Amino acid sequence: MVDVIKQRLDSLREVMKREKLAAFIFPSTDAHQSEYVAPHWQGREWISGFNGSAGIAVVTLTKAALWTDSRYFLAAEQQLKGTEYQLMKQRVEGTPTIAQWLGEQLAEVDSPEVGLDGMVNSYHEMQALVAELRQKGGITVRTNFDPLDIIWKDRPSIPDFPVEIQPLEYAGETLQSKLSRIRKALRVLHADGMLVSALDDIAWTLNLRGTDVHCVPVFVSYLLISSNKVSLFVDERKLTPQVTAYLAENGVSLYKYNKVEDELRTYSEYNILLDGDETSYRLWKAVKCQEIVSSASPIPVMKAVKNETEVKGFRRAMLRDGIAMVKFLRWLKPAVEMGGQTEMSVDRKLTSLRSEQPLFRDISFDTIAGYHEHGAIVHYEATTQTDAQLRPEGMILIDSGAQYQDGTTDITRTIALGPVSEKMKRIYTLVLKAHIQIELVKFPDGASGTQLDAVGRRCLWREGLNYLHGTGHGVGSYLSVHEGPHQIRMEWKPTPLRAGMTITDEPGIYLAGEFGVRIENTLLVTNYVQTDFGKFLQMEPLTLCPIDTAPIEMELMTPEEKMWLNDYHRMVFEKLSPWLEEDDKNWLKEATKPLK
């Protein structure tokens, strides 16, 4: 792979010289600012060899560097090894910004110009980068050129897989009702219309789903909503007669996907709302109407608060997922003891068991199954080169999830496969304590996830421990497993948590070269109590799966924490046992027996 990356960089630099570009920047996103992207837009991976979901590659005529966050530090070190790419660790002291690095690298170049594809870089990112580069020696930016169109000879085409209707029995709200709410929000923002670029927002609004992106049931498109018209820009080959008729019945006009830029140039309403974090730089610049209302899209918050039907769907999906997880966990340790199991084989087994459940559509992300030191790689993905043989000792971290038509699941369990060290027990127990504290918290309506983050981390900070990823993210309803805008994380995220939101609780500790521990449930924010001081909220676990008690250091657990775990395990057994065969039920009874 090292030689392949060198050849690709050589080809890129030949094109850069011809185009008089001093550098080119490759983000990890697509034309819709998606986290997970279709193969057509996986250019950053193609040019660098790094396959993480977050990262930016920057190539000059003589150097190459890749920026990524803490989830991928270890994976990036391994994947970039032997290439000329220098790893830049984001949010680590001493790491330069892209503009700072380019300013240093291009200091001796006369009138340097940097290239970016304006269709895959958001307006806000571009605006900030252009301003910073201008300060670093007058570097200019070109946005109308994509060298991958020239050098990536077998570049996959934009996907055109079929679209399907998400029935009202799972969606819980009609397309027309959603449009009415969106238009009402636009009036409050003094906007006549809006462009929707985010694929999950489009799928949610229209009650449609697709398979254009691995593990995320969305379809490549744009949606333009005005006061009296709705326009969907999509490859019509995706649309079955049923979907076409459904859209026509709901007054949705169809246009070719690649005509969105032309339509924006002739947009006749007085103004339009554009979300600078979701709208590409090129589309923003195409708008010619009198005023652009620069504002966050109102759709993500609407989508984040699940309606009653969606909540019921989540509960059903979690029940089926819990059944699959119990079958898997009962199988796991005996299978490892018999020998022959690897990280990849247990991944296949878990996916197979999930696929037996009704309404299963896909996994919700590529399973992370990290044994021993691989567990310390936050977003590890086993390959044939790294696939570790499992032994009846130590711990394996398994982060996995599924897409069911009535709900999306995301769960992490760290499991002792046999004897574990005292160090492992201590770290495991501290992570469990952090997990429990988030589930125990009660908080006033209007609090953000940032204000709750320290509640979970506190017991880790006392021990001088920390993790650099977020504590929790929203989860879509048969949509993206990572959903915003609400999060639980250290960095300031002002979106308040509201009853009806789903969010994960996933603290972890990762010791490079040794092991990692993460424990994750998906939670539902619910009403707790109304007092003279206002409304208070709480967290309800939706995930139904036992937490391994074998590695717990009991002396570290408080009575309140033991009570929470016992209550959780009681609920898991009560809800799952009626649906289990006798052997699975007996195993679950043992796995959920109360702590003393």
Regions found by a protein language model. Give the residues of each.
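Active-site neighborhoods and metal-handling regions in enzymes and metal-associated proteins
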Residues: 1-596
